[in-house]
Design a protein with these regions (language model features):
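OB-fold nucleic-acid-binding modules
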Residues: 1-127
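Trp-centered recognition loops
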Residues: 57-59, 233, 274-280
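Terminal, low-complexity interaction segments
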Residues: 104, 253, 258-323
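Extracellular carbohydrate-recognition regions
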Residues: 125-177
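Extended, low-complexity, turn-rich repeat/linker tracts enriched in Gly/Pro/Ser/Thr and Asp/Glu
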Residues: 15-18, 208, 222-224, 235-246, ...
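Short beta-strands within extracellular/lumenal beta-sheet-rich domains
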Residues: 199-229, 279-281
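Extracellular beta-strand-rich recognition modules
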Residues: 136, 213-216, 222, 226-238, ...
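Short, surface-exposed beta-strand/strand-loop-strand elements in extracellular ectodomains
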Residues: 244-255
Length: 323
């Protein structure tokens, strides 16, 4: 049976928990003919999501942010939208964090969600304006050349990590490739071999050696906005004993003589905790970011001789879009 087929159906007619007519316990289906689907003009229920109700399976459309399970129509809405039995062909599972328009047949209210059986999903892009993004995926040639591993994703302390200065592709080291894009590494003891490559992300430090990174010049970030953030994924390293390296990260914004330092919350993990990425977010409210701003992500423990190792990926400056 395909969408658009004209069919003969034998089964038991009943209603679902939303009191809408349905057919369940189907005994026999016969395809009488094929055909194209002529969908009616959908009713947009986005602006009335909290008040909408219907005793029929009307054809509707709604726009919102998909969070992986439901659609948020607005920050003030009491109800969200659940897409019922969405076929994989719609690709909805890949649209987490996107603004999407879902069109389909109304399937009733099951508080706190309005239910829709989708016939179409339109991707309207990510729910944010991105002013800066670095995911280090462009380091793939160096990752492949060195055979480095994924310590965080595999929770494997023995995953290979090679110094950026020791990996060369087409005559360029990974260290130089990063700095050619405007980044600048900082490190103690004049030892630049303590920044390492993992599979398309960075590892900083070893026992007694510490390091950090200065971002390239970033332009176009609006001033006087309350909802612009700098965010990144990070993780501390676990020692063979199970102890988590006591890393204290900071982000420093410097505009001439003006300096703002933001502390990143500590991981607070117990010994033996499985390695995993943690998202750090820094509000840029009241902080100027332009092409002359120096932004440093680093650790505070520069004078200690202990292990304070950490991983970094997915740096972003962004602003959410209001629906």
């Amino acid at each position: 049976v395909a969408v658009g087929d004209k069919i003969s159906l034998l089964g038991t007619k009943s209603s679902d928990s939303q009191k809408l007519a349905t057919v369940i316990d189907c005994d026999e289906v016969t395809v009488l003919s094929g055909g194209a689907v002529n969908y009616p003009e959908p009713e947009d229920i986005s602006a009335k999501i909290d008040d909408y109700t219907s005793s029929k399976r009307g054809y509707v459309t709604v726009k919102g942010v998909f969070n992986g399970s439901t659609l948020t129509v607005s920050e003030d809405a009491k109800y969200s939208v659940s897409v019922v039995d969405a076929p994989s062909s719609l690709g909805l599972s890949a649209l987490t964090g996107h603004i999407v328009t879902v069109t389909g047949y109304y399937a009733g209210l099951a508080e706190p969600v309005q239910r829709i059986m989708a016939t179409d999903v339109e991707d309207n892009g990510l729910n944010e304006i991105v002013y800066f993004l670095e995911n280090f995926e462009w380091l793939e040639p160096w990752s492949v050349a060195s055979g480095v591993g994924q310590t965080v994703e595999t929770d494997n302390l023995d995953a290979k990590a090679t110094a950026l200065t020791s990996i060369t592709v087409d005559g360029v080291t990974a260290f130089d490739a990063v700095e050619k894009l405007g980044y600048k590494f900082i490190y103690d003891k004049n030892d630049n071999k303590r920044i390492y490559l993992q599979q398309n992300y960075l590892k900083f430090g070893k026992t007694g050696n510490h390091a950090g990174i200065i971002l390239p010049p970033i332009d176009g970030v609006p001033e006087a906005k309350d909802n612009v953030t700098l965010s990144f994924d990070w993780c501390g390293m676990r020692q063979g004993s199970g102890k988590i390296d006591p890393v204290n990260l900071i982000v420093i914004f410097e505009n001439g003589s003006d300096k703002v330092q933001i502390d990143i919350p500590e991981l607070g993990w117990e010994d033996g905790h499985k390695l995993e990425w943690v998202r750090a977010e820094v509000s840029l409210k009241g902080i100027t970011v332009n092409k002359d701003t120096k932004i440093t992500i680093t650790q505070t423990q520069w004078e200690v001789g202990t292990a304070n190792r950490w991983f970094l990926d997915n740096i972003k400056i962004s602003e959410p879009i209001k629906l």
